[in-house]
């Protein structure tokens, strides 16, 4: 029953890449529950030690997507996901999650795909749940939210039920694996534009090409050279930019965006509760215009606005992001999403009362 995964583990240990076809078959064994937890853990570890190829990643992503509950929001224009692989070296607040609401407030439809933390302190699901979001939305409810609110949140376990077979092994081995990469590549709403933060610069170009093969129209795959899986305002950022069927690579520094160099401690967030409060303060206008946390969100939101087709460059993208926050639209998107999820608005009301 599990001949392929056994053979694949041996090949990987020997340092041999799996073919596209072998990768498809072994992922089918994982997603169907045929592989044991020990076999899955061995496979993930061996893949990580060898280094995943683009072919392996694409094949795994295709099977994972086939096994998911997919939705097809009816929207005009592009549908964007802002997400990261997690596993970065700096424990920041939830930058890409905060940026998603700024992008939505700028008129770009967002299908945010996320999960609880696996290797970091606060996943997107953790922080949004703290703010009152009901994670148990049906696929139909999420589709309606994207169409009517302009943003929806897809809780990975609800949309990827077959992933239950890998949850235990992932948590038990406690290392970054191919699944950190697969989540962002398998958006159940088939988002056709993306800002994808990665924990390793070496992943940027391969994942940009993987997104192209998987049907993405425009994407920025980004890695802060200081260890961030975001566009960094602390130091340099490597960007692999997919547009018009071509992938180009570049490096940026904070001054390219017109923002000051931040210090790492200025963008950290320790707990889901702390990250939730930071997200609230940024969206509700309780951070100064030059607050490093607001600035890094604006830079990353600008990337989402660009791939979403609303801006040609970071300067205009950031201008639209500022308008999204200053007008209150970004915060309204957060409240509307929580309402659409049949969630609890009491946490937001508590924060509104606290900050006046």
Label each residue range with its predicted role.
Residues 51-117:
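Active-site cofactor/substrate anionic-group-binding motifs, chiefly glycine-
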Residues 44, 93-149:
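A glycine-rich phosphate/pyrophosphate-binding beta-strand-loop-alpha-helix module
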Residues 2-13, 79-84, 111:
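N-terminal small/glycine-rich loop or linker at the start of catalytic domains
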Residues 39-40, 111-113, 221:
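Short beta-strand segments at enzyme active-site cores
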Residues 42, 98-102, 296, 300-303:
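Short amphipathic alpha-helical face segments that pack within enzyme cores
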Residues 1-4, 12-58, 66-74, 296:
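N-terminal glycine-rich anion-binding loops that anchor highly charged ligand groups
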Residues 3, 11, 18, 66-69, ...:
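Glycine-rich anion-binding loops and their surrounding alpha/beta cores
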Residues 26, 46, 60-63, 320, ...:
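Short acidic/histidine-centered micro-motifs embedded in hydrophobic/aromatic stretches
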């Amino acid at each position: 029953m599990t001949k392929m995964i056994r053979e694949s583990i041996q090949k990987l240990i020997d340092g041999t890449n799996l073919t596209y076809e072998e990768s498809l078959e072994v992922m089918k064994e994982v997603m169907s529950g045929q592989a044991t937890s020990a076999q899955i853990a061995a496979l993930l570890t061996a893949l990580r030690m060898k280094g995943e190829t683009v072919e392996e990643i694409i094949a795994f992503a295709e099977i994972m997507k086939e096994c998911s509950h997919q939705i097809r929001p009816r929207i005009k224009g592009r549908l964007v996901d802002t997400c990261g692989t997690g596993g970065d070296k700096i424990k920041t607040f939830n930058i890409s999650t905060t940026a998603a609401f700024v992008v939505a407030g700028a008129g770009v439809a967002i299908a945010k795909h996320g999960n609880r933390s696996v290797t970091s302190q606060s996943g997107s699901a953790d922080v949004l749940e703290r703010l009152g979001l009901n994670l148990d939305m049906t696929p139909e409810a999420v589709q309606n939210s994207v169409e009517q609110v302009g943003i929806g949140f897809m809780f990975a376990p609800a949309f990827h039920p077959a992933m239950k077979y890998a949850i235990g092994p992932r948590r038990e081995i406690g290392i970054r694996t191919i699944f950190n990469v697969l989540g962002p590549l398998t958006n159940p709403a088939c988002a056709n534009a993306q800002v994808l933060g990665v924990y390793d610069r070496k992943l940027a170009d391969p994942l940009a090409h993987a997104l192209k093969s998987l049907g993405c129209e425009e994407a920025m795959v980004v890695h802060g050279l200081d260890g961030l899986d975001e566009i960094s305002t602390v130091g340099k950022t490597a960007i692999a930019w997919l547009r018009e069927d071509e992938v180009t690579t570049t490096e940026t520094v904070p001054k390219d965006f017109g923002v000051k160099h931040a210090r790492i401690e200025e963008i950290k967030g320790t707990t889901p509760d702390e990250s939730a409060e930071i997200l609230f303060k940024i969206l509700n206008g309780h951070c100064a215009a030059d607050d490093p946390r607001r600035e890094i969100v604006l830079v990353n939101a600008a990337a989402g606005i660009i791939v979403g087709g609303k801006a040609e460059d970071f300067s205009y993208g950031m201008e639209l992001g500022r308008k999204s926050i200053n007008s209150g639209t970004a915060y309204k998107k957060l409240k509307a999403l929580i309402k659409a999820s049949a969630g609890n608005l009491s946490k937001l009301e508590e924060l509104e009362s606290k900050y006046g």
